[in-house]
Amino acid sequence: MNGEYDYEDGAQHQDGARESAVAGASNTNQISTSFFPPPPQVYKKFTKRNLRYLEILNSHKLADDEPSWDLLSVTQRLERQNAILRQPGSSSKIDAEQLQDEEADMAAIQDQDCDKPMTDLPDFDLKAELEPPNVDWIEEDGGYTVFGQLWPIPDVTPTLQQLGIPVLYPLEGTDRKELLLTLLRTLLQTYREITGDLLKPAQPYDVWVPAVPDPNLTPEQQQQQMATNPGFWTQTTEAKDRLKHMQNVVVNMQFLINELRPVQAKETLKLIMQMQLERRKQEMQLIQERCATMRARVEELKKMLGKQSDCYGSS
């Protein structure tokens, strides 16, 4: 019993040490493995103190001989920002006690700033980090960048050719339903063939992979890119080729399904309208039936009253 207990205790200690090591490694690398990752850390900069500083910068009027903020470099912007915030006067003076009261509710998101004295100024560009983006500039540039990914305006769905994926179906004049069934049969057939390839010894061979031009470049730049880097040789096997073919088939199926989204939305809207019409018809039929029942009841009451009046008259 004691030996078994010691073994379990030792296993628990080992598991705890392993979990601590993993936690320490994750904290060191700052990698989030959560299914719902936390928001970007830029939200910590939106404190009440920084927003007050931003109001001071926006209320400051530049002299005629001073260049605009957009013409300054990053270092020059920080120097001007610190110079404006250090100016004495009521417009640039922030009461420390008032700031402490205002930031008491935001202590959870300002753990790193709480240890700093209130006289410390931000070490980042307030106008660049806290001001909302300029919509005119976004429309002029034709898109915006979020977390390193470019989103064009209006939103444009890239074609399979632009993604470097071969098109496995004719582009025009074909029923998409039949195309999806054909691609599904191709996927199943390729899956059966790849199971047979796994039972045979691998025989690698070299294939030429052509380069795909960058769709964001101009045609002249694309030609220059293809001239300098037309492609490369790589080693592959039949199993790898079939696996790549299966991936291309799945992407083609997804692309066709996405093209059917407007049709699906249209048919769904038709179905909803038909359901609403049928419900209105059922409600109208129910009302008519109730009205007919009430009329019949009223007629019965009239007949009963007529018979009673005849009986009283004859008596």
UniProtKB/Swiss-Prot annotation:
GO biological process, one term: regulation of transcription by RNA polymerase II
Recorded GO MF terms: transcription coregulator activity
UniProt entry tagged with the keyword Transcription regulation: yes
Gene Ontology terms: cellular component: core mediator complex; mediator complex
First-listed, main subcellular location of the protein, grouped into a coarse class: nucleus
Pfam families membership: Med7 (PF05983)
Transmembrane region(s): none
Region: Disordered, residue numbers: 1-36
Superkingdom: Eukaryota
The UniProt record lists the keyword Transferase: no
Compartment list: Nucleus
Keywords: Activator, Nucleus, Transcription, Transcription regulation
Comp. bias intervals (Polar residues): 25-35
Binding partners and assembly: Component of the Mediator complex.
Role: Component of the Mediator complex, a coactivator involved in the regulated transcription of nearly all RNA polymerase II-dependent genes. Mediator functions as a bridge to convey information from gene-specific regulatory proteins to the basal RNA polymerase II transcription machinery. Mediator is recruited to promoters by direct interactions with regulatory proteins and serves as a scaffold for the assembly of a functional preinitiation complex with RNA polymerase II and the general transcription factors.
Family in the record: Belongs to the Mediator complex subunit 7 family.
Name this protein carries in UniProt: Mediator of RNA polymerase II transcription subunit 7
Source organism per UniProt: Mycosarcoma maydis (Corn smut fungus)
Classification lineage: Eukaryota, Fungi, Dikarya, Basidiomycota, Ustilaginomycotina
Encoding gene (name): MED7
